């Protein structure tokens, strides 16, 4: 079983964590290709391409300039500790013990516009490149064409040892679209998190993102191998609702914190 996550825009390279092992990303050559494209763009071009403020555009141009194919403790940080958005606040990797991080390394994959796929302990240099960015590149007009079936091939290989391969999709559609399902050949289970608002249950982005991280943490802490066990997820007031779910789309609802 693999759990898929989206990356985060917000990054934390200030907090240092000693004694955490690291690995290297799988697609450094491809990342280098993309960085070479990005390095030729001005802050104004990056601002327009990514719809960023002038300050954020300048920051990311500086990141592209500083990016190197050689990763080190000086320029990199483990992905699961570097990402700092809503999903990763829910996951709270900083409080996980080494054994949990080791399990996550083999069962969690973070999809990335620049790195393709990151394992939790893969070193990552800071960047901003969302998967939906229409970046013209040597392989096509966007990142979906650039990555092609590479991401799916990697995930397929990771699942090869499983008799009944299952992917738990906790990523956004923007990122999951980068996975070629014809190549992956696995059962895909989508987890949907809904909150009660305005008289009905609906997906509220902030809460749903955080819940994806909470679900990943739940699986990591319990080292879940059987996907069905995820239906027991009961963190932060969420609960599985069979009547709103089907075989491959599992709905978890929260009426208010602590109440289904």
List each language-model region with its residue ranges.
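Active-site helix-to-loop segments that bind/position phosphate- or nucleotide-bearing substrates
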Residues: 4-95
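Internal, well-folded beta-alpha domain core
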Residues: 93-260
């Amino acid at each position: 079983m693999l759990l898929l996550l989206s990356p985060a825009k917000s990054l934390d390279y200030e907090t240092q964590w000693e004694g955490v092992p690291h690995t290297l990303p799988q697609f450094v050559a491809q990342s280098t290709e993309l960085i070479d494209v990005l390095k030729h763009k001005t802050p104004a071009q990056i601002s327009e391409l990514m719809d960023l403020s002038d300050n954020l555009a300048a920051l990311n141009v500086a990141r592209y300039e500083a990016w190197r194919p050689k990763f080190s403790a000086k320029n990199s940080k483990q992905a699961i500790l570097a990402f700092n958005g809503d999903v990763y606040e829910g996951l709270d990797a900083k409080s996980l013990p080494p054994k949990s991080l080791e399990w996550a390394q083999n069962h969690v994959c973070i999809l990335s516009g620049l790195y393709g796929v990151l394992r939790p302990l893969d070193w990552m240099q800071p960047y901003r490149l969302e998967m939906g960015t229409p970046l013209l590149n040597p392989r096509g007009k966007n990142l979906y064409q650039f990555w092609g079936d590479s991401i799916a091939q990697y995930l397929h290989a990771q699942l090869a040892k499983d008799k009944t391969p299952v992917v738990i999709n906790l990523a956004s559609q923007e990122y999951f679209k980068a996975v070629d399902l014809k190549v992956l050949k696995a059962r895909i289970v989508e987890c949907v998190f809904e909150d009660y608002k305005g008289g009905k249950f609906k997906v509220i982005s902030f809460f749903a993102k955080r819940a994806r991280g909470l679900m990943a943490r739940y699986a990591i802490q319990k080292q879940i191998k059987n996907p069905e066990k995820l239906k027991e997820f009961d963190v932060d007031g969420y609960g599985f609702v069979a009547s709103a779910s089907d075989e491959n789309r599992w709905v978890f609802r929260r009426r208010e914190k602590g109440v289904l």
